[in-house]
Amino acid sequence: PTTLDELSLSGATNIYAKISNYMRQPDMYEIRVLGVALTDVDNNTARHKRNKKALADTVLAQYICKTEIRHSKNIASAANAAVPVTIALPTSNPSVDYNALTAELLARIEADKEAE
């Protein structure tokens, strides 16, 4: 998961570079990238749109999840209560988003299994 700001874009790209080094050594490591999930998303800002376009122009573009976790104060409230937002506020936007992301990632896992 990553927020969509300039530092996160750089950091995610650097992390992927390190992971890809391991991916090129299949005899020693079995590692794959399942996806890049965007969190704390606010689609209404020019900054978000600019950074999303920048991310789409990176090597990570193929891994970007369709589901995004929307910005919400409910996430902080649940964290302060030490309870996952999906349990604390199951009908909130973040809960809906996290459940959709889970379904998307499970579908990717199944697709990978079928492709093997």
Task: Report each predicted region and the residues it spans.
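Inter-motif core of Ras-like GTPase G domains
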Residues: 1-6
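Beta-strand-loop-alpha "switch" segments that mediate conformational coupling across diverse proteins
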Residues: 34, 40-44, 53-84
